[in-house]
């Protein structure tokens, strides 16, 4: 798996090789970034943005955001195997200083740890997990979003 674009373009990232997790496909990532870049309706750009990567897994979306100029990415993931790979990737790419990792369930991190405001919220929950709906409500309740923001599911 490689980084698609930006300062880290072409660099490899490690990923988990099991049936319970799946990395975000490059084609999906590219489509998301194209929409963000070219849409007249979305007033958020990745460059200089603060990103919240929820259910982040190995962090491929957040790492791609850093490569494309995001100021900071906050990762939330409770799978310890995925977090181990995520940390390895951030260290290997020398971008650990532009990230923050919360090793817990998304709802716990949102309730107890997250207070800064974000431009981009990226949700990539497990297939059968519908808790993201409650977590969107929690984001609204806590008002941890910038005036111009986007939620991607």
Which residue ranges define each predicted feature?
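Class I S-adenosyl-L-methionine-dependent methyltransferase catalytic core
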Residues: 1-153
């Amino acid at each position: 798996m490689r980084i698609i674009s930006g300062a880290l373009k072409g660099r490899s990232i490690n990923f988990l090789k099991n049936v319970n997790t799946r990395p975000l496909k490059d084609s999906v990532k590219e489509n998301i970034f194209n929409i963000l870049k070219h849409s007249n309706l979305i007033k958020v750009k990745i460059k200089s943005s603060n990103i919240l990567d929820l259910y982040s897994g190995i962090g491929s979306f957040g790492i791609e955001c850093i490569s494309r100029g995001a100021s900071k990415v906050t990762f939330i993931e409770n799978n310890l195997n995925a977090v181990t790979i995520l940390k390895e990737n951030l260290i290997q790419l020398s971008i650990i200083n532009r990230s923050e990792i919360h090793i817990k369930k998304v709802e716990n991190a949102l309730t107890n740890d997250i207070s800064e405001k974000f431009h981009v919220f990226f949700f990539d929950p497990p297939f059968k997990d519908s808790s993201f709906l409650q977590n969107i409500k929690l984001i609204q309740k806590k008002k941890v979003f910038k005036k111009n923001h986007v939620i991607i599911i």
